[in-house]
Amino acid sequence: YEVYVDSAGSSSGQFSVGWSESSRSITDDNSSGDTEGWITYAINGNYYSNGGNGSYGATYTTGDVIGCKIDTNSSTNNIEFYKNGASQGTKSQAFNTGGTGFISPYILLYGTRNGTARFAYNEWTQTPSGITSSNAINTTNLFGA
């Protein structure tokens, strides 16, 4: 999926996009040490996860498009984030889905920041490398739209 940064807002607030276990509450913040598996790429260029945080990629701002890609076929769930089509690198993230296998998009916004998420392949402005119309999620079948 991708998120268009509609407004980067002021210096206070949060804008992070990524993945989490479906059991994670949407009211949780980006606190390291949580028991649910999650990882995000934040507006300040850092990554945050339940396993820690650190330097990751470029900062982003209003008008940028952030792409989020996950390879669940790998044993470590390889996750890659993109800024305007350019890969920011690959991270590995363990998820404890309790056998459900549900990993969900995770978008954290507060303050004066907002964005627009696009889940349909034909709506993306930037297509991550390795993704084609034949291997992208078919949102028509997924959501019945």
How would you name each of these model-derived features?
Residues E2-A145:
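PRY/SPRY (B30.2) beta-sandwich protein-interaction domains
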